[in-house]
Amino acid sequence: MLPVAGSDVTVWSPQGRIHQIEYAMEAVKQGSATVGLKSKTHAVLVALKRAQSELAAHQKKILYVDNHIGISIAGLTADARLLCNFMRQECLDSRFVFDRPLPVSRLVSLIGSKTQIPTQRYGRRPYGVGLLIAGYDDMGPHIFQTCPSANYFDCKAMSIGARSQSARNYLERHMTEFTDCNLNELVKHGLRALRETLPAEQDLTTKNVSIGIVGKDMEFTIYDDDDVAPFLEGLEERPQRKPALPADEPAEKAEEPMEH
């Protein structure tokens, strides 16, 4: 009996699709949102941390790979941990064998080759995680996106995870400003984009935000908990939906649009 399309990664559907890969792409959309963006001198990752319950600590969303590279994840954390270990090993090999840091584009190419294997072999499943890779090398700062389909993209700015379309809308509106931003302004743009993914009643705090920065003369550094506070202090308050006024009281201003 022939296997049903969608039950196995080696079986094509009549429409020319591989459903198992598409299901893995959906796993990325279930993960908490993360944002990556770059200027002429720096690349920044900003991620939203989730806690599985009130008794659990917040999960790490930004991982250190090498002095010049870090990643943020959306999707299955276990798969991300495996890929991160692979990336660390490749960076170490480059330093021991060639005595130089591994170029970011080369590392992303290796990740693409590794994640392509389970999309083609029987008995394997695609990695259910998407990565945003921030790095700095001789070519300048980089932001790359990788997908469970083994595709990867060089980006000026990108967001993946749950409700990430709202963040991408913000990034598209302000993309022309990123190139000449100083580091603090670049981080603020990342935080504003990440805040767009939150429900109206929530806001960014030192507990649910993680920031990773790499750039010229700056090794990859992760900021968590209290270290995030200086970046959040300079961020304006999130505009809230105004409560409806009683019928006998006229509205003072109707200039600002309501939040959608």
Curated annotation (Swiss-Prot):
Residues 250-260 have a biased composition (Basic and acidic residues). It is found in: Cytoplasm; Nucleus. PROSITE patterns: PROTEASOME_ALPHA_1, PROTEASOME_ALPHA_2. One of its GO terms (cellular component) is cytoplasm. InterPro entries: Ntn_hydrolases_N (IPR029055), Proteasome_alpha (IPR050115), Proteasome_alpha-type (IPR023332), Proteasome_alpha1 (IPR035144), Proteasome_asu_N (IPR000426), Proteasome_sua/b (IPR001353). Residues 231-260 are annotated as: Disordered. One of its GO terms (biological process) is proteasome-mediated ubiquitin-dependent protein catabolic process. Belongs to the peptidase T1A family. Component of the 20S core proteasome complex involved in the proteolytic degradation of most intracellular proteins. This complex plays numerous essential roles within the cell by associating with different regulatory particles. Associated with two 19S regulatory particles, forms the 26S proteasome and thus participates in the ATP-dependent degradation of ubiquitinated proteins. This is Proteasome subunit alpha type-1. It comes from Gallus gallus (Chicken).
